[in-house]
A protein has these predicted regions:
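Short, glycine-rich nucleotide/cofactor-binding loops
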Residues: 9-16, 104-107
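A cross-family phosphate/adenosyl-ligand binding-site feature
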Residues: 7, 18-83, 87-88
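Short acidic, Gly/Ser-rich segments with clustered Asp/Glu that frequently serve as metal-coordination loops
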Residues: 13-21, 206
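C-terminal accessory domains and tails appended to enzymatic cores
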Residues: 143-145, 164-261
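Alpha-helix C-terminal capping segments
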Residues: 80-86, 114-125
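Charged helix-capping and loop-helix junction motifs
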Residues: 107-114
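Short beta-strand segments
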Residues: 10, 36-38, 94-97, 128-130, ...
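Glycine-rich phosphate/pyrophosphate-binding loops
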Residues: 120-142
Length: 261
């Protein structure tokens, strides 16, 4: 008996995103494809979960059976594993996000990576793939042909993980691919610890986020994801672990001093 791998595909750009279709086509030969995605865009929502009612609708995306939910990317993981599949997938592939996910702020804010985090928390290998448009105002004009490099990279990485497992001590791979690459060069990077600049502008008697530009990312050190994409124009592959534990040693000194223990 031949057992096919189950690949759960999610995103934060919504069920109708060309990036979701591109990723599904890229991975279709590697196993059973299950698509669960928000019914509308959820960019910047991180790992948020819905506390209200989540509706699920069965849809078809270019021949792929898919499920559209009125929830978040992290909800998509839970609905897929607990209600649709009723088991864990072999891998979660999140994307192809139309826009960058670079630096610590993006990692914590991204709905794409939020879904990957949810998978990783539950012991499922996860890959988050982002196509780094330099000007997010071009997002709705990206074609599937433009995503060919991102599709090829996604297929290669997911195929490796299904055969060999994740690299040791890695739970998520965040892959950022510069737009319109003429040659494929890859660097292993770390997450840049840089915060956003002033990202809000005045609008309608309030403030809204300005159009997202690669050039607006703060300068980061060589060896980071931001530097690789912004300055070197190469593909960045960033291994991520989700442990939130800090060093207890100095906290012991604090507790002894504050509580006289």
């Amino acid at each position: 008996m031949i057992f096919m791998s189950t690949i759960l595909i999610v995103n934060d750009d919504g069920i109708n995103s060309v990036g979701l279709l591109a990723l599904s086509q890229a991975l279709k030969e590697l196993g059973e494809i299950v698509i669960v995605a928000p019914e509308c865009e959820c960019s910047g929502i991180g790992k948020a979960l819905s506390i209200g009612l989540i509706h699920v609708s069965s849809v078809e995306i270019n021949g792929f059976k898919a499920y559209s939910i009125s929830g978040t990317p992290a909800d998509a993981y839970f609905i897929a594993t607990n209600k649709i599949l009723k088991r864990k997938p072999d891998i979660v592939a999140a994307g192809i996000n139309l826009g960058p996910n670079l630096g610590l702020e993006d990692v914590l804010n991204s709905g794409t990576i939020g879904a990957a985090l949810e998978a990783a928390i539950h012991g499922v290998p996860a890959v988050a793939i982002s196509y780094c448009i330099r000007d997010i105002r071009r997002k709705n004009y990206v074609s599937i042909d433009e995503l060919k490099v991102a599709m090829d990279v996604s297929r290669r990485v997911v195929k490796y993980i299904l055969r060999n497992g994740m690299p040791n001590n890695v739970q998520i791979l965040s892959i950022n691919i510069p737009e319109k690459l003429s040659d494929v060069r890859v660097k292993i990077t770390r997450v840049a610890h840089v915060g956003y600049c002033d990202i809000h502008c005045e609008a309608d008697n309030g403030y809204r986020i300005v159009p997202w530009l690669i050039d607006n990312y703060r300068d980061a050190e060589p060896g980071t994801d931001v530097y690789a994409v912004k300055c070197e124009n190469v593909i960045s592959i960033t291994p991520i672990r989700i442990s939130l534990n800090g060093d207890c040693k100095d906290v012991e000194l604090l507790v002894k001093d504050v509580f006289n223990t």
